[in-house]
Amino acid sequence: MRRFLRTGHDPARERLKRDLFQFNKTVEHGFPHQPSALGYSPSLRILAIGTRSGAVKLYGAPGVEFMGLHKENNAVLQIHFLPGQCQLVTLLDDNSLHLWSLKVKGGVSELQEEESFTLRGPPGAAPSATQVTEILPHSSGELLYLGTESGNVFVVQLPGFRTLHDRTICSDEVLQWLPEEARHRRVFEMVEALQEHPRDPNQILIGYSRGLVVIWDLQGSRALSHFLSSQQLENASWQRDGCLIVTCHSDGSHCQWPVSSDTQNPEPLRSSIPYGPFPCKAITKIFWLTTRQGLPFTIFQGGMPRASYGDRHCISVVHNGQQTAFDFTSRVIDFTVLSEADPAAAFDDPYALVVLAEEELVVIDLQTPGWPPVQLPYLASLHCSAITCSHHVSNIPLKLWERIIAAGSRQNSHFSTMEWPIDGGTSLAPPPPQRDLLLTGHEDGTVRFWDASGVCLRLLYKLSTVRVFLTDTDPSENLIAQGEDEWPPLRKVGSFDPYSDDPRLGIQKIFLCKYSGYLAVAGTAGQVLVLELNDEAAEHAVEQVEADLLQDQEGYRWKGHERLAARPGPVCFEAGFQPFVLVQCQPPAVVTSLALHSEWRLVAFGTSHGFGLFDHQQRRQVFVKCTLHPSDQLALEGPLSRVKSLKKSLRQSFRRMRRSRVSSHKRRPGGPTGEAQAQAVNIKAERTGLQNMELAPVQRKIEARSAEDSFTGFVRTLYFADTYLRDSSRHCPSLWAGTNGGTVYAFSLRVPPAERRTDEPVRAEQAKEIQLMHRAPVVGILVLDGHNVPLPEPLEVAHDLSKSPDMQGSHQLLVVSEEQFKVFTLPKVSAKLKLKLTALEGSRVRRVGVAHFGSCRAEDYGEHHLAVLTNLGDIQVVSMPLLKPQVRYSCIRREDVSGIASCVFTKYGQGFYLISPSEFERFSLSTKWLVEPRCLVDSTKAKKHNRPSNGNGTGLKMTSSGHVRNSKSQSDGDEKKPGPVMEHALLNDAWVLKEIQSTLEGDRRSYGNWHPHRVAVGCRLSNGEAE
């Protein structure tokens, strides 16, 4: 009965927990999912992006970030900053207006929603009468002019959103000021443009969709002049001196109209169709910007020839005889031009073009000849190719960091040297305490290295593995330079490229040794590459070795995709990580596990068929081990023919549900009679399974799984350790492997000493085989030394960055399966402790990592614990080696299967997971390590808005990027409410990740359902937490 007794409450331990553990969701890295609106404040130099899920994100200088979330789950249609103020107005698709303010509290700025408003019409009026289409914040900062679908312009006073009905500009009133010939045409309908006169705040421009443009005198309530076009109006804007109006139209034309009090109905000075004479698409927005040199900039969106280029997403820039149509790979949401902010200035002098596309943000330098792009310090398009895996490395040595940055800088020669132009606000966060890397593998065979040290996730270097293989579309053979005379003058910009040359190139596993510079990557078609960092470009052949994982098996036939064909002969590689050996697994199945030991120069790899060990110093295979069970036919079908096993998959799913339901009833009686009754129940449940879809929730105790379940040989984890494997007197190198069927294999390795390492071969011999009784998949293996501390990383002791492991006391083996944790003594491998995670909750371990938790009070105190993520989205911290649960937090929605599958833990109690295809959510479990924005925006100290200078380097001077603070801890189960967090989407990842995850998920959840979801937070949102 002792095991049923609750342990006593220990106040000292509870206080220590508060010093060690605290859950926070801190910052979102990447590009906002499904952007829908763009805004910019010239006085604050802050950019705003709205999304379809109702989020508003503000960005200034690197490290200056804010986020707000509307209570309503509606798309943001427009964002407008109030001139000269720290306020902005948003328009949602439910026709509601919201006023936001940046207010200083506690020395930092917070984004708060002040009030909301919906324009109401008279009783019985049609909804279009008050449907807002255009918003003009007046320069006074006290009035909003709202154009509507009915053609009326309403005036709303701020603050308070009070409608001034006596100042409404009705379409009937405007009609009275038009000449007789214009009154007979349907010149109104909706308002398409509202612009204040750049020199006279008493005049506004009103543009109607039917082609009428009116200059309205606010004081005299009269039309000063009007302009009538024969084409439908899309947009209109002033020239800086107010003497010229530029309009753009639905036929792909734009016109210039002189503004004069003498002429009431002038003809356009100039009308042109830039990409005519054939029918063109509409020009939806246009800027006409003056310069000191005298030649203006004309920048417009759309207008491409409808027949040949109607599917292109282009923004054209015309200046001084040069014309370029910037071609984006995703739909353009909106754009703006950064120019001289002082209204009294004589010229616009534009210096940057900011384009918000559906999948990325692009900034073009308009000062430098050729108009090159500007490198982004944040808002990176993480999903330029679909993310398939991720890997985090903490505390990178300075030398390796500098070498990676140097290799990356050579890839950035096409970027402008302009300093980042959106530099509003001040980051108050201290410099990050260490250098961290986040590596992401992608579907197109690339690996991207990101600076994850602080708030800004910045791309440092991109590695491509494509050159190692021959693909159907070789980029080196298909690059066709565009001639100078080609029309239209298209130029591809941006990094988003959703198309992959070959899905087999996808990266599935990454392992980087930060001490030696060795990198191992593995892919979808069984390819394993070992790479070494080289500071110079080189040309060499990549040695190829085949690892046949089925060499001892007969009668198996692989039905999946073929292997990738390696490129023969020497290959040119740029500076950076260069591959020197390729290990090709046969069959070419997805590589499911990878481990690299740079001190022993060994790399281990596993698939659904087995695992192998390769000596990359001698370029030879050490051994392969087939883990297939005779029933693992599904493992041979491969991802491209998985649909063939649908019937078998459904049958196995119902068997699992049947066992779950039966186990929740009374215990099965013993003897033949009980077995017969149980068999009858099983048969009946299987027959009626398809009809009875309303099943009880899965609540089961741990039970042994059948050895005939599919994918029992699926290798889930690989682990190197120098420990006591054969006897307690001698320790030796070893390799451990855990499979989907609950089997753990241990191989003792004989690695020759350094002086004979190149001559003598590495030898391996199987020493142990452990079969877990419940046969749950093994997701983690760890060896603890005599002091119960995890063994250090390879070369960590040699670099004096870790103490030598205690080899005097007895070592312990920790095996983490999906359903329980178990500690074994070594070398006898006798069970010592265990923790059942899934007793009655149906939860299973999805991710596990070892983290060091430092105390926020005592600098020299810390503990090593396991960070565990379950399929329910909960994160638990479990002590080692006593396996005592410490805290538990709810982190990810249980429906977000792909978000759970993408989670990665760091060595210091932080983590990342994908909340959308383009965004990582960062969270922290530690009180000591917390990266969050802390910034200040002060309107009274607005910067002088000179154009950014062009200097040497990339201009990405990261003055601050994170904040490490100590804060009040949270008790278990009462975690801090997540603040401005967008858990609004699931990962729409590559088919490879879907296939692997669907294999691992017992309940066969559907990937097709995408249910947007938001965390309910208050209106008051700070840049780190909700209040």
UniProtKB/Swiss-Prot annotation:
Record's compositionally biased regions (Basic residues): 654-669
List the GO cellular component terms.
cytosol; intracellular membrane-bounded organelle
Region entry Disordered, spans? 654-678, 940-981
Identify residues that carry Phosphoserine.
S653, S971, S1022
The protein's matches in SMART domains, at most eight in alphabetical order, are given as:
WD40 (SM00320)
> What family does the database annotate?
Belongs to the WD repeat L(2)GL family.
The protein's name in its UniProt record = LLGL scribble cell polarity complex component 2
Q: Which organism is it from?
A: Mus musculus
Gene for this chain? Llgl2
